[in-house]
């Protein structure tokens, strides 16, 4: 009985810790996107954030409202509408205040925080 109780305790603690890390990751993703939106609205361009598209584990992507990808690890210069319409439909729900969206990308469920800039760019990142 003690072994069973110990296993349950370890499982519960593991889930609690994973949830804490998960919340911290969501906060980091949101902060990163918010900082980039503020920088773009302060005069930076999407091209200034090309290095952010290479960061792991949560790369940043920036696209125009029409779906043209400006910053992304592999889709730069392509239309997200043509490459992945469901992903485009999700990220195009970006608001000036930011919102979390879900979509499927390469058979995996994705969650992304997306915000729109005053000039209509969409900045996002997720897991």
Functional labels for PLM-detected ranges:
Residues 1, 23-24:
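Absolute protein N-terminus
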Residues 1-8:
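Bacterial N-terminal signal peptides that target proteins for export
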Residues 24-59, 65:
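Juxtamembrane segments flanking the first transmembrane helix
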Residues 27-43, 74-102:
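Extracytoplasmic/periplasmic sensor domains and loops in membrane signaling proteins
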């Amino acid at each position: 009985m003690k072994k069973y109780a110990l296993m349950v305790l370890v499982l519960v603690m593991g889930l609690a810790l994973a949830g804490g890390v998960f919340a911290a990751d969501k906060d980091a993703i949101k902060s990163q996107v918010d900082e980039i939106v503020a920088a773009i609205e302060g005069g930076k361009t999407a091209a200034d954030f090309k290095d952010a598209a290479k960061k792991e584990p949560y790369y940043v992507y920036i696209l125009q409202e029409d779906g043209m990808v400006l910053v992304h690890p592999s889709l730069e210069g392509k239309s997200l509408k043509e490459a992945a319409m469901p992903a485009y439909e999700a990220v195009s729900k970006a608001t000036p205040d930011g919102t979390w969206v879900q979509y499927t990308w390469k058979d995996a469920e994705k969650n992304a925080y997306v915000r729109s800039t005053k000039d209509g760019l969409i900045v996002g990142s997720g897991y």
